[in-house]
Regions:
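Charged low-complexity intrinsically disordered patches
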Residues: 115-118
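Short recognition helix of helix-turn-helix/winged-helix DNA-binding domains
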Residues: 1-69
Length: 118
């Protein structure tokens, strides 16, 4: 298959996941796998939907719901890898926090803002 070039404003025709450059440049995040960094970008993107839907907890913190199955679909990976990447973001980097809801409901995911220290 041969692809054509971009012409003029065509370069703006796609939507993109935004991954903060600091995840690649800051020594604190160097140990994170590239897949975990990509997943963080996907989770940040999902936050836009949560903001539109006003998914806020009692402390006005934005949360997302993104199941393991959705991660597997987004990254074309197996369950084990999806779970490992979430653990990497949560335990190793502290970039997300999960809150279990119980009763078979998916966990709430808080995507952390690493640019602001609390």
């Amino acid at each position: 298959m041969q692809f054509d070039y971009f012409y003029g404003s065509q370069a703006e025709q796609f939507s993109f996941y935004r991954i903060p450059k600091v995840l690649f440049t800051d020594p604190q995040f160097k140990p994170l796998s590239t897949d975990a960094k990509v997943l963080y970008g996907i989770l940040l993107d999902r936050m836009n939907l949560s903001v539109k839907n006003q998914w806020l907890d009692e402390q006005s913190r934005v949360y997302i719901i993104f199941t393991t199955e959705e991660i597997m679909e987004a990254l074309s990976c197996a369950n084990q890898k999806a779970c490992r990447l979430m653990l990497e973001l949560e335990k190793d980097a502290g970039l997300i926090e999960r809150k279990r809801q119980g009763l078979g409901k998916p966990s709430l995911i808080y995507v952390k803002n690493f640019a602001v220290s609390s």
